[in-house]
Amino acid sequence: MSMKTILVPMESHDAMQSALETALLLGRRCDCYIEGFALRWTINEFMVGDAMGGVPLETYREDNAEEAKKAKQIFETFMQQHDVPPATETTESLSFGWLDNASEGESFIGSYGRVFDVIVMKRRDAHSGPMHDRAIESGLFESGRPILLSPPSPPRQIATNVLIAWNCSTEQARAIAL
């Protein structure tokens, strides 16, 4: 099986550079289509307020939409700076695309990631919280696809030495088959 599609869940901060570099390095090596989408955290409406005050739900939604725009801008700017062309219907070589209408919540990675060969995410760092961990777990356990966690600084080469951690679960069997 050859890798032809890469999914990159995007957040709107500079720590994403390493994930983008890693995805591009793999994309160039395998001549892949790289797709990004804004990883947006969901908030339940019953959790919006507390005894000391609250966060207006509309303000939260506006902030979430603004973060999604920033994530898209980071992704598209990076791809354009590295001369990666946007995908067309006939493109069969290295190209990129953006999913505008991604659902909120970390579980989207698990369901949407099933149609991709690999999911590239940044490793946990100071910007990460428990939601980021759940997003990684969703991608790994629900998509059944391999997750490539990018190191804090981008690698110079990729796929020369590979370590696979496997706990013998059925969820990971398909990821290992790659």
Task: Name every feature range the model reports, one short phrase each.
Residues 14, 62, 66, 103-107, ...:
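Residues at secondary-structure transition points
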Residues 12, 95-100, 125-128:
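Short, flexible loop segments at the rims of nucleotide/cofactor-binding pockets, characterized by
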Residues 1-58, 142-145, 156-178:
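Small/aliphatic-rich secondary-structure junction motif
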Residues 1, 41-43, 80-119:
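Structural beta-alpha unit
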Residues 35-37, 97-101, 148:
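General small-molecule cofactor/ligand-binding pocket signal
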Residues 71-82:
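Ordered, amphipathic secondary-structure segments that act as subunit-interaction surfaces
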Residues 56-70:
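A short acidic, glycine-rich active-site loop
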Residues 20-28, 106-155:
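Gly/Ser-rich helix-loop-strand patches that form or flank binding pockets
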